[in-house]
């Protein structure tokens, strides 16, 4: 997608949900996982486990003494998702500034389209104890591959002495996360929410509960996501169960609830990205939804009636995480770049372009009152983005309030393939009609 397309969308000529939003690409990669019945064949995990033995080949890798021996090589290879960094005329202003100030060249690769296929791509190199070609990779916490990389010892523990900006500016949602206690292996890149949305023209008294998805008053007008991980998680929330600490017996209870929802005729369909269009068209009144789609839809006066709920049971938050794969050739350069993105000045530029949940709360003030190199960068981006800086700074979907932060929930972290199989065997049949 070009920057011009982005600008046209802002002007109202193109549906704003089509341009880069908070969560749009998140769905495509989740769908790739879901359609595959959990995303990973058992052989991928088992082969990896046999090759690695779930331990580092060199136990000293990632220790303070190991890090002290590492040197800057003035190059870093960074693998990320497409359309996920500030871009102007084909270049990233933040990456250019990093190179200018540190003399570290960044080779930036947009090679990750979904977690599963990318994991399958780098797994053979890791199993063979070889460099993957990347010093930084970005993986999502609610998909199995990140857990596999951690469990198999295929990520280098971070050098916390080089996390100055992170320690000072990282927000509470990304510090000490459930999927990586102490941020041993990861630093968040960006985050997003999965929640419930409704059309306020048809739904007059929505309340503040995910139970709206199970209200018979809206039978045939309710949309659910066709991602088994999202579907199962909202079922658990509806039962008052914390997804992150849930058990297989509780998964079964959630599946029964969701099957009843379907059998009772409440569900119009199980949607991929198309759910947002059905909300806009008015044939679906209530739906599971990604925060970014609603944010983008609200940019058009035509869709101001679409509302994202903040349910009392909580919002599911996914996070894309920067991490350093084992055998990386430029780990110190990688650490330098990762911490650079935790400067509020830098993050304000990224966030103005991305509009995701920002990992650095201080970037809000830098958007409202730029004080550094970001002033020129933001000014350069503004004609392409077509929105005031305050549109990003004042959005609770980018800079959540304390209430939203308290209601944020994390996904269950699968420990092995058997757990993935157990989950998908319960929730995929609901989606697929079995």
Positions of predicted regions on the chain:
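Conserved C-terminal helix/tail region of periplasmic/extracytoplasmic solute-binding proteins
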Residues: 391-434
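N-terminal twin-arginine translocation
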Residues: 21-31, 41-65
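Ligand-binding pocket segment of bilobal, Venus flytrap-like solute-binding proteins
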Residues: 146, 221-227, 231-235, 243-309
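Early extracytoplasmic/lumenal segment of secretory-pathway proteins
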Residues: 56-144
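N-terminal secretory signal peptides
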Residues: 1-27
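A structural signal for short loop-to-beta-strand junctions that line the ligand-binding cleft
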Residues: 67, 130-138, 156-195, 221
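Mature extracytoplasmic/periplasmic domains
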Residues: 325-403
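A bilobed periplasmic-binding-protein/Venus flytrap-type ligand-binding module shared by bacterial periplasmic
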Residues: 195-202, 236-241, 318-333, 349-352
């Amino acid at each position: 997608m070009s920057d011009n397309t982005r600008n046209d969308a802002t002007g109202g000529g193109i549906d704003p949900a089509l341009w880069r939003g908070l969560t749009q690409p998140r769905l495509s990669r989740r769908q790739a996982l879901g359609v595959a019945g959990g995303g990973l064949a058992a052989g991928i995990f088992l082969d990896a486990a046999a090759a690695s033995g779930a331990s580092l080949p060199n136990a000293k890798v990632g220790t303070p003494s190991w890090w002290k021996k590492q040197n800057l090589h003035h190059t870093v290879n960074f693998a990320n998702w497409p359309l996920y960094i500030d871009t102007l005329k084909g270049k990233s202003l933040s990456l250019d500034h990093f190179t200018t100030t540190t003399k570290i060249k960044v080779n930036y690769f947009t090679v990750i389209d979904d977690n599963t296929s990318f994991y399958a791509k780098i797994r053979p190199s890791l199993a063979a104890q070889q460099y993957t070609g990347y010093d930084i990779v970005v993986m999502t916490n609610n998909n199995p591959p990140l857990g596999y990389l951690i469990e198999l010892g295929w990520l280098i523990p971070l050098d916390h002495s080089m996390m100055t900006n992170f320690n000072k500016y990282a927000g509470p949602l990304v510090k000490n996360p459930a999927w990586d206690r102490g941020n041993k292996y990861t630093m968040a890149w960006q985050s997003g929410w999965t929640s419930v949305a409704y059309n306020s023209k048809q739904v007059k008294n929505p309340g503040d509960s995910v139970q709206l998805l199970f209200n018979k008053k809206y039978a045939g007008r309710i949309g659910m996501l066709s991602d088994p991980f999202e579907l199962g998680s909202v079922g658990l929330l509806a039962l008052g169960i914390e997804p992150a600490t849930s058990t297989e017996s509780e998964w079964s209870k959630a599946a029964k609830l969701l099957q009843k929802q379907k059998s009772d005729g409440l569900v119009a369909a199980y949607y991929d990205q198309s759910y947002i269009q059905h909300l806009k068209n008015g044939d679906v009144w209530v739906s599971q939804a990604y925060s970014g789609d609603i944010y983008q839809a609200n940019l058009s006066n035509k869709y101001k009636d679409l509302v994202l709920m903040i349910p009392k049971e909580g919002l599911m938050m996914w996070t894309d995480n920067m991490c350093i794969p084992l055998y990386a050739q430029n780990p110190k350069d990688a650490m330098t770049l990762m911490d650079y993105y935790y400067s509020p000045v830098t993050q304000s530029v990224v966030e103005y372009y991305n509009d995701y949940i920002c990992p650095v709360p201080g970037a809000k003030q830098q958007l409202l009152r730029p004080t550094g190199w970001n002033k020129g960068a933001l000014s350069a981006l503004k004609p392409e983005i077509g929105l005031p800086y305050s549109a990003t700074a004042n959005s609770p979907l980018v800079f959540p309030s304390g209430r939203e932060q308290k209601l944020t929930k994390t996904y269950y972290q699968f420990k092995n393939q058997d757990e993935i199989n157990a989950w998908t065997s319960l929730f995929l049949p609901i989606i697929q009609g079995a």
